[in-house]
Amino acid sequence: MALPLILVPAGCSTGGSKQVRRPGIAPRLSAVQEEQTRQCLANLAGTGVMFERLPDRSYGGGCSAIGAVKLIDIGVPVSNLGAMTCGLASNFSAWARYGATPAARQILGGELIKIETFGTYNCRPIAGSARLSEHGRANAVDISAFLLADGRRIDIRNGWNSSDEKVREFLRIVRASACKRFRTVLSPDYNAAHHDHLHFDNGGRGGYCR
């Protein structure tokens, strides 16, 4: 595992303006939370994923990046990844490896060479709400497109209701795979705010897949 670096988390490019806040001292974790984070980091390292442990940060307004990592190599390149909670990073890595990659091969007949995202951390409320988004806790990631070795780029905006049956099937399969790993998964079927991306997060009570 690489030595930790102090990095400012990347913001998400959709669903609200990005707020720049100076990092402060994060609240102290309980012994249980510290043990959960330690175990998560050990499990993530055991999968062969390369990552950097980030320092805990509080950005004010309820926004924070606690128990977070920056993924370096999960087996397929991913754009725009900033701070992610360890649990989110673990689930995302597994989804990319065991969900998206084989789905591209089996359904589209191509090798997945890149996953494009709109980012992870972004201190903002949920679109149309005053409630803080899970992005504000580094606990969400938005997927925008998939790039294949043959040059095809499958993006959510144009692919979700594509005339190509295989493209539609692929995107719904990767959503279904995500629903097995994340507490909340939102797609263009949820609302217009998600017309161009798949939102995955580990917040709330879980069990919401749309």
Regions found by a protein language model. Name each.
Residues 13, 39-41, 62-64, 85-87, ...:
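Sequence contexts marking disulfide-bonded cysteines in secreted/extracellular proteins
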Residues 20-46:
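Post-signal peptide N-terminal segment of mature Sec-exported envelope proteins
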Residues 36-115:
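Active-site acidic/histidine clusters and adjacent loop/turn architecture
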Residues 106-138:
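Active-site-adjacent substructure of cysteine-protease-like catalytic cores
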Residues 15-18, 60, 66-68, 132-210:
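Catalytic cores and adjacent binding grooves of peptidoglycan-active enzymes
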Residues 8-11:
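C-terminal motif of bacterial Sec signal peptides marking the signal peptidase cleavage site
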Residues 25-31, 82-91, 129-130, 156-165:
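Second-shell loop/turn segments in exported
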